[in-house]
Amino acid sequence: LYEDGHMTKRCQGNQVRCGVAGYFDKTAGLECRKVHWSAANAKKHEGLEPLAITISNHMKEVSPKTYEFQKSKINKDYIFKDSIFSTMTINYDYRTATHRDKGDLEGSLSTLTILEELEDNYEGFYTGLPEYKIMFDIRNGDTLIFDAHEFHSNTEYIVKSKELEKDDMTGQPFAGRMAV
């Protein structure tokens, strides 16, 4: 809202601690390439490869058809080494509104893996699929395999400990939850 009372056509969401590692798709005449973070942090990018392999192995075990489908579609030059994944989106302590993911491989499933800096440091943060009226309590090391093109979200959460640093934006202590 402007000072004179008329509405702006812009909107601003809350700032989110998130990042992308891996590779961009080919777009607007640009070839596939590493995202800036991965290009600038080659050793850290390589450090994510064991996690990508572990998540790939979960997919292979739980949904072998999806694993083989995704494997048939990948370009081996643009993946985390020895995995089926080209990209990792990383969200820290972030509650999402109900949404559908875009940009993922159509006809495939997605993974959501939780890593906790301090185990059992929060209550809530359930991942929900509202159309199916189901929620999951995904915890440290767990991987959920689901269709992220379906509506999904996660719930509010309460941080139990003040052991971790505080968020500069909110002043609240971090839960220490990373969703990959």
Set out the residue ranges of the language-model regions.
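A short beta-strand-loop-beta hairpin characteristic of the jelly-roll/cupin
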Residues: 116-139
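Fe(II)/2-oxoglutarate oxygenase catalytic core
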Residues: 1-111, 116-118, 135-136, 158-180
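Conserved metal-binding segment of the jelly-roll/cupin
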Residues: 113, 136-151
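Short, ligand-facing micro-motifs at secondary-structure edges
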Residues: 152-156
